[in-house]
Amino acid sequence: MFRLRAHGKKPITITTTTTTTASTFLYWSPESSPTALSSPTNLDPNIWSNLPNHLLEHILSLLPFKTLLTLRSISRHLRSLILSPSFISDHSFSLPSFLLLSHPQSFNSFPLFNPNLISWCTLPLPRSLSLTCASSLLSSSNGLLCFSLSPSSVSSLSIFNPLTRSSRSIKLPCYPFPFELLSLVTSPKGYKIFTLCSSSSAASSRSVCLYDSGDRSWRKFGGVDQVLPRGFNQDGVFYNGSLYFARSEPFLIVSVDLNDGKWTTATGDGVFPADDEITFARLVSDPEKKILYMVGGIGSNGICRSIKIWEFKEETESWIEVETLPDIVCRKFTSVCYHNYEHVYCLWHKEMICVCCYNWPEILFFHVGRRTWHWVPKCPSLPEKWSCGFRWFSFVPSLSASV
């Protein structure tokens, strides 16, 4: 048995047992382990205090994940070891993924839905964010959340990893900084923040502002107004190094390269109904299989009669229809969004294409692998008076996502 103590904190005791399986090899508790299968053996603390890193890392790898999170607060050495890239890469942890719900009237926490367990839980926010930022969650990617600080003035952004409880404040390039369509894009090397910005003058042209965590600097590119009209409110989707946007009137796919800010325009060939029109078009991307999908409403005179899903075939640069929403489900969805398709947005989450509406607390999703449609039920903790402003995000906790 040995103890780990941080200055001013209660010690945590690690108790060894005579069993050797990974699940029962180590136990921990504030004083001693009540669940040990055999009597603990007192070990010389001088020996354990000089334990080599590779042995300590092996012992830590046998602990349950929740125990590891508790041990982070014991000392800086343990925290840096547990969060080190080598430890994370050598020891895989099975972490659940969630659909996160944000609402303007939620200030201290976010509801989380686990699709695998079909259950709800809560993600509390640290005090530094909870007072102002719950209503201003802007984007999420690979376990990182991006908030705007001081919503009334927006002078900086905050990148937050809820799992490691680490955060970084990013100063915006100027003040005031009116922006739109912000997207957080992560990679093994860090992350980038994309947004469109303009000056206070309504007649001024807009620019792409791109932040790179590698050199912690902003760059600016032009050419936005030629491809995206003012008032366009659908976030971009990351695919093959670029952010893609879909316009429905007229139907148009545009993309911007996140390295050089260059815009590309393509209509995209596809088998679309000749006598109908695309009433709305939304893009989602599978980051693991690198597949781009489009969810589109088909109808006439601005009224959606059916909802379809297309897959983009890069080798032929064409869209292939892969799924049609059942009529009875389509009628329910179009009724809850009141045929106001500007309220419709889509996101990708772990083999699921999620179709959401800002004024409806449920999610309609298509499981790509099973080819089945489902509804995510309303969160039981939501007040009945909340009738709009629902915004969903994919949240996949990650220890390796650095701020």
UniProtKB/Swiss-Prot annotation:
Identify the stretches annotated as Kelch repeats.
91-140, 192-240, 291-339, 343-393
This protein is called F-box/kelch-repeat protein At5g43190
Q: Which organism is it from?
A: Arabidopsis thaliana (Mouse-ear cress)
Q: Which Pfam families match?
A: Beta-prop_KIB1-4, F-box
The record's listing under InterPro entries reads:
F-box-assoc_interact_dom, F-box-like_dom_sf, F-box_dom, Gal_Oxase/kelch_b-propeller, Kelch-typ_b-propeller, KIB1-4_b-propeller, SCF_F-box_component
Q: Where is the F-box domain?
A: 45-91
- Tell me the domain of life: Eukaryota
Q: Which Gene3D superfamilies does this chain map to?
A: 1.20.1280.50, Kelch-type beta propeller
UniProt entry keywords in alphabetical sequence: Kelch repeat, Repeat
